[in-house]
């Protein structure tokens, strides 16, 4: 009579291992990774928990398992506490206030005991452009090396760059697109951003 044994190792929360032995011989061995949705690039409404001046960073609750890490140099001036009055300046740098609501984007997933790396400088990738709502700078992807192409693309977007308050970068996918296609992508991204802000 054969004797089957199933062994399961689920010590690691990210990986489960299962083996089936029959009479001491391995019949089957399976490894299953936990299905985890990547969150890099996601945008969340968050609350500042604590500002650590020594680290020049804030810890932020964005709904993850542990608070995220937000370096103060990655905080857009629109969130500086002293804009609303009563905020502090430390070492010539404005800081956030605990309890302050902010919009953040995940730059790097949390690893081991470290929380996710965050920024308030949001970037929204579109088909032909990347919208940067917290910045006023405009540009063309470095991968587009031809000066003629770079000038042509910036000429297409010059009226938008003058009128609008949002920065953008024209992606390599936008290289052979016309003014209408680039403007349409820009309009779509600005509507998306305004919807996120509401």
Cite the ranges covered by each PLM segment.
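Single-stranded RNA-binding surfaces
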Residues: 1-198
